[in-house]
């Protein structure tokens, strides 16, 4: 299996697509699809969008700015459930709109930095992981996005776990294991 080296332009290309991919998947879906979860303290697709908005405001770009300031770049701990109280009573459509707007602005800002390879190697300090580089932070942003796109699809699929009856063993999205060979 191949592995990619980090490339900022390829990363931005994925990051710019995330709002549209999630909008295509979620816009206009019924509440049971949007609000279903995998159990206590797990995210629904609605929560995924709220969490991504919170990350746009408090995580990826603010942490990158700390690194680029070349000062003490110790990141504040991140509360992954902070978005829930703020988004109570909001519509999924309003969250999708806000996420798209914030992401576009953040990517415009990142492009304006004109990052060099030396910039990408600048250090930061994650509260749990220890030393990280700007390159690692930006790569993690991409993987975080892809993980949450997959999570939204997985959570939606699991709403039909009982409905598919005997097909469960052939649907790894429902069981988190490989498909048996037939």
Can you say where each PLM-predicted feature lies in the sequence?
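Short, contiguous alpha-helical
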Residues: 34-78, 121-182
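Hydrophobic alpha-helical segments and helix-packing faces
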Residues: 8, 15, 41-45, 53, ...
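A short secondary-structure junction motif
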Residues: 25, 29-32, 71-74, 113-116, ...
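Acidic/histidine-rich alpha-helical segments that form the ligand environment
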Residues: 18, 23, 80-122, 132-151
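Alpha-helical bundle segments that constitute or directly flank the non-heme di-iron/ferroxidase center
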Residues: 4-33, 54-66
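Basic/polar N-terminal segments that are highly enriched at the extreme N-terminus
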Residues: 1-6, 180-182
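Small-residue-biased structural context
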Residues: 11-15, 19-27, 85-90, 134, ...
């Amino acid at each position: 299996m191949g592995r990619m080296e980090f490339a900022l332009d390829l990363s931005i290309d994925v990051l710019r697509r995330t709002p549209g991919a999630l909008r295509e998947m979620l816009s206009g879906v019924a509440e049971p699809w949007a609000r279903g979860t995998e159990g206590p303290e797990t995210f629904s697709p609605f929560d995924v969008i709220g969490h991504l908005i919170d990350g746009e405001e408090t995580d990826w770009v603010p942490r990158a700015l700390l690194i680029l300031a070349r000062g003490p770049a110790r990141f504040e701990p991140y509360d992954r459930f902070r978005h829930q109280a703020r988004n109570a009573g909001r519509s999924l459509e309003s969250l999708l709109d806000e996420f798209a707007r914030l992401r576009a602005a953040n990517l415009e800002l990142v492009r304006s930095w004109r990052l060099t390879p030396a910039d990408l190697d600048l250090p930061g300090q994650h509260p749990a992981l220890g030393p990280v580089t700007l390159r690692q932070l930006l790569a993690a942003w991409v993987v975080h996005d892809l993980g949450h796109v997959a999570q939204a699809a997985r959570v939606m699929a699991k709403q039909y776990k009982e409905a598919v009856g005997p097909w469960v063993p052939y649907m790894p999205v429902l069981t988190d294991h490989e498909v048996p060979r037939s």
